[in-house]
Amino acid sequence: MNITSSKWRIIILVGIVLYFIYIHQRLHIRPDHIFLALLILTLAFGKKGARKFLFDWMPFIIFWMLYDMMRGVADSWRGIIHIKDIYDAELWLFGPLFGGKIPSFFLQDFQHAIAGSGIKKIFDLAAADLYTIHFAIPLLAGWILWHTTNDRAMFYRFAYTMTILNVLALTTFFLFPSAPPWYVMRYGFAQPQGELIGAAGSLVSVDELLKVKFFTTIWDHFNPNYFAAVPSLHGSYPIVVILFMYKKFKKHLPLLLLYPILTWCAAVYLNHHYVIDLIIGGIYTLIAYLVMSKILFPFIFEKTIFRSGITATFPEKLKKEEAILAEKQVIT
């Protein structure tokens, strides 16, 4: 669709209206909803560069909307929560390596053993930092591809690998709701009843260290779905990021690999994920990449968007347009 057309703007406007109707009915309208809507409208009705930014980055915006909207449907649509089967599989696979315990519980015992020490504070802060930059790092990687290196084709491959991954993950969250290890540690294998607390896991230690309730508040009150452990997006996003950073720059692979490895360790250390969750997240990443590279990009994007020139580099197109306009002014 031509992003300069009024029809495209009408679609955006109607989409925003429907979005507000939905969240008003299922949730409650928050300031961040209003901010996001105003941002989208500003870009949609802005200059050509702004509209192209919105068009290219729309997959990330739509995912955030859908993920946030899970607050209104996750509790009412889900069936039986998978609790013991995931735990038993983790114990069977990794119990012999961790003294008959699952890795996350083994690390909880380790934390208790070093409680109050400086090394525990370092581990807690490092794990919290890695865990909380989860959503920011993919956006930074996207910005590097889209703006810094101005590689629109690579950005599309990255963005739609993320999109396919997110679609697969959201579908799984609904069809296979699964409890993380912090739930088993606090509630056992019983199905959830009423309001849940403790979703921050070992991030509570960081709150206690900093004398705040930041992580407790975020995970207990702003988490859209407590039972979205499989697949682990903390396990999959870092792989997508380092895959495309290496494809683009062809250097520093050992250093890049540290990011997913440390993030996986943080997810287990904080009692938020089983190792199985992370492995499944990695498998989902491979599937998403193959679908993007073998089907979506060659059969759709190369024959539509890139052929039409929608994703031509902004600076080059803007310079050409300015030159044409200046030439017309000189002639007149």
Label every PLM stretch briefly.
Residues 1-12:
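N-terminal membrane topogenic signal
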Residues 19-31, 42-53:
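Short, hydrophobic transmembrane alpha-helix segments
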Residues 54-137:
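Intramembrane catalytic core of multi-pass membrane enzymes that act on lipidic substrates
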Residues 57, 139-176, 181-193:
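Interfacial segments of alpha-helical transmembrane regions
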Residues 140-147, 235-253, 283-294:
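Membrane-interfacial alpha-helical segments at the cytosolic side of multi-pass membrane proteins
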Residues 175-248:
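Membrane-interfacial catalytic/cofactor-binding modules of polytopic membrane enzymes
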Residues 180-183, 229, 262-287:
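Interfacial helix-loop-helix junctions of multi-pass membrane proteins
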Residues 291-327:
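Membrane-proximal cytoplasmic C-terminal regulatory module of class A 7TM GPCRs
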